[in-house]
């Protein structure tokens, strides 16, 4: 069974992945693998340089600020970058043999259609908590955080398309929710 973990920026997906790891479950981090593939794949580097400009890589190192600025300019830019990166990540996941994956933009990117997924788990959190988490974690302004949140599908839509929910509202403990999820999935 292939299980995808998703949720908006700042929802706490990484913490849920940590709890899963503590329970012996390795989760394929789509974002981390996308970054690794951009670092190691000459083909991806060439395609992105052609699309964005040669300055997106300096001595083979991705210039995140240039990529981010390009992505924030338009939805067409996001789709063009996704069309290059996501097929490579989907192929890499399929080759990995892992049964869990984590992707913040599972539905936004169409990644759920690029590879077989049996069940989807959505990590949710109130927007004010998400905003605070991202501002602290990334050291960015509230406006920039809201810009990134607006680039993703609304949390309600992601939840509607998911099979399970883990609520990360700083009130309900996460570990019991993860344990319950694992027991339900294993039935």
Briefly describe each language-model feature range:
Residues 92-94, 101-133:
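ATP-dependent NMP and nucleoside kinases share a basic, alpha-helical "lid"
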Residues 3-5:
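Hydrophobic anchor at the beta1->P-loop junction of P-loop NTPases
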Residues 11:
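ATP-binding Walker
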Residues 8, 20:
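P-loop (Walker A) phosphate-binding loop of NTP-binding proteins
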Residues 14:
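Walker A/P-loop
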Residues 32-99:
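ATP-dependent small-molecule kinase phosphotransfer cores
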Residues 89-93, 113, 136, 140-184:
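Small-molecule kinase domains that catalyze NTP-dependent phosphoryl transfer to phosphate-bearing small molecules
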